[in-house]
């Protein structure tokens, strides 16, 4: 890897990253959709396959998780207009936001209350299906609710699943795996919140805690799983299945936009702002959206100033060969879901030609935005889930991207979607504490 001095000379923005200042980065490697998709390791067929699998599992999900009965076992979240929050943002940052502002409430996804309910649950279901098909317990034509039986649970109990997580991925994989009957172990990094560990233990999940950061928890989890032939490791850094589970969100969002009569075409651009940790969740969602809307959707990743791993990897082209700690950043943030020092190389390389840009936001800003959203819309998110909220302000303020893409006028007829990644499962006392911090920082 290059010396820090060489990186600073070649990429002046590195200096601001080191100083943990907020930055806005436009991706110089973005390509037109038709060109980018040609070299992509994944395609529309892969996403459709994931979508079909989730439909097959819908009867099982509806039976085992009553909260999904209303959607017939499809795990989906609301898309809501947040006009009052938009006004508050414009007033606070003295910056008009051209276009409509919507919030995708993955914070309120059933089962595990975060975006990770998409990829995490999907990968566990895919593995369960594979085992059940191999052992003649299921055919693809069956009603999958038959998996909710003592026989199936006893069968799955002979197998184990492991994952490394800062919290939310562990919740979705732990809850789903335990329900099916698997023995499940979640390796949790130092920044994982106590309530998330407690919730997992209450579901019968084995939680192993580490004093190190996320990368160490994943590494240990992978090592222990490798030593056990009956253990399946969900690899958050490299998993195509997780990525595809997230990508399914796009076609669901498309239907919701149509219901709200929101048009997306070359004259009505769509901007999407996604909090980013290791990259799988935002990468998968953005990839799915690109497949549908091609050059008419513009996706931005949002990271904490103390954990800008994806921005660093993309900007330098080093991807997972560089960690924020290599340039002296501590990777300590209250945005626990985004506290990742080294990005996924698979996601970075896959998304490089599709991603519009990346920006960072301070913890203090996240708390202020948390309070503002609660006050204006009565929606409570966890700190990491607010990273996308400042995106529309940044894109409209730093209008270089809009100019480059010839969107300065079109943005007025466009739509901004902030992806709210988690929060509904946060205990009330913890959420009150978050709100109090936001209040202190606002006064």
UniProtKB/Swiss-Prot annotation:
EC number: 4.3.1.18
Keyword annotations from UniProtKB, A to Z: Lyase, Pyridoxal phosphate
Signal peptide interval: none
Gene Ontology biological-process annotations: D-serine catabolic process; isoleucine biosynthetic process
Residues with the N6-(pyridoxal phosphate)lysine modification: 116
Family assignment from sequence similarity: Belongs to the serine/threonine dehydratase family. DsdA subfamily.
Protein name per the record: Probable D-serine dehydratase
Biological source species: Bacillus cereus (strain B4264)
Gene: dsdA
